[in-house]
Amino acid sequence: MEKFTKMGPMTTTSETERYPRIALISTHGYVAAHPPLGAADTGGQVVYVLELARKLGQLGYTVDLYTRRFEDQPEFDEVDERVRVVRIPCGGRDFIPKEYLHRHLMEWCENALRFIKKNDLNYSFINSHYWDAGVAGQRLSEALKIPHLHTPHSLGIWKKRQMETDYPEKADTFELEFNFKERIQHELIIYRSCDMVIATTPVQLDVLIEDYGLKRKHIHMIPPGYDDNRFFPVSDATRQMIRQRFGFEGKVVLALGRLATNKGYDLLIDGFSVLAEREPEARLHLAVGGENMDEQETTILNQLKERVKSLGLEDKVAFSGYVADEDLPDIYRAADLFVLSSRYEPFGMTAIEAMASGTPTVVTIHGGLFRAISYGRHALFADPFDKEDLGITMMKPFKHERLYGRLSRMGAHKARSLFTWTGIAQQLLALVEGRTMMPVLEEADWAEPWNDGD
């Protein structure tokens, strides 16, 4: 990593140019200072890049977060005094799903380079996010002759394997919907061409080495993070006030996020049916979807409601849509249990936020986060495809008061100790600047052995 030991020169004269400039690239979805979380392709990754950008700004850098401009979006969006969203047009005015956006990125790169040169901008390095932005990031890196660090967030080979295992009868349709062949071809080129690949979990690191053929020295592991100034536990009295505001009664199980098949809300409903048979006070609250759902999202929501009806759970399951960003910490606190039931999940930002808020959490085994936690100490994990396993696991904190208290207390402690955005931004800068720094997580020590005597 010798080429990262010296930051690039600064030649512009504006006030902000006293600080080194970084280019983050996240091309798909609705990237904004206040994004409509839950909208198409707008979820945990958007939160990730925004929080990373903010922390890099607080650490003394000026950050331009590049994305695609479409619909009626403005060219710029100011996040704070050090961070702005820069929107570059390509592919017309309509929304384009992330699976097919790469076909328009040559135009995007040409427009981005034109913008950078026109404004005499000099960047120390590029950090791209997801494979579509990786295509763009590598082209800009080569044109500008600056380092390119790529964060995949999700891996095509891993996702394809998971989906073919979970839905073998639908395997023939996946290529048309998810464009795996082109995606994996581009991933192979990006990962071998960029200066460093940043894995967010040990699962990703393993796949990058074993399936993509990368050398270990070409990969650095930095986990996702959360904002510890927003997500933290509160007193019981405050929590009861929050519950009243949301109208929560009984023992509330919460799930939230985008309306997508891979999120496994249908599996959660099945598992909840097992819990509801054993715990009469159990209630399920699904805060899923966005303000303006597309046809596919509407279909998924209708299917979920039909599933609830077929199981006779209408009086125990509530649906709400978009949760405003300012309400996220409180809805986590209001719940008695949070469940991440994804069919596949590279990490699971929502689970970390829930743990940080003091809410006991159940995590899918089909992803990276469960390897970071100690079962029964920080959180619980289950196989969402096994409704009995998921249902019984959800029941445990409600039946064992000591376990509930431990998960609330130690889950929040685990999140604070390993997953704050400040530590993650510092890891990225240490990597770029060639400084030696203790990893946020050693891949061999993601979860210490469980100890009942905490």
UniProtKB/Swiss-Prot annotation:
The keyword Transferase applies. Gene3D superfamilies: Glycogen Phosphorylase B. It comes from the Bacteria. Its cofactor is Mg(2+); Mn(2+). Pfam families: Glyco_transf_4, Glycos_transf_1. It catalyses: beta-D-fructose 6-phosphate + GDP-alpha-D-mannose = beta-D-fructofuranosyl alpha-D-mannopyranoside 6(F)-phosphate + GDP + H(+). Its EC number is 2.4.1.246. Induction: By salt. GO terms for biological process: disaccharide biosynthetic process. Optimum pH is 8.0. Keywords: Glycosyltransferase, Transferase. GO terms for molecular function: hexosyltransferase activity; mannosylfructose-phosphate synthase activity. It comes from Agrobacterium fabrum (strain C58 / ATCC 33970). The lineage of its organism: Bacteria, Pseudomonadati, Pseudomonadota, Alphaproteobacteria, Hyphomicrobiales. Pathway: Carbohydrate metabolism; mannosylfructose biosynthesis; beta-D-fructofuranosyl alpha-D-mannopyranoside from D-fructose 6-phosphate and GDP-alpha-D-mannose: step 1/2. This is Mannosylfructose-phosphate synthase. CDD domains: GT4_sucrose_synthase. Belongs to the glycosyltransferase 1 family.
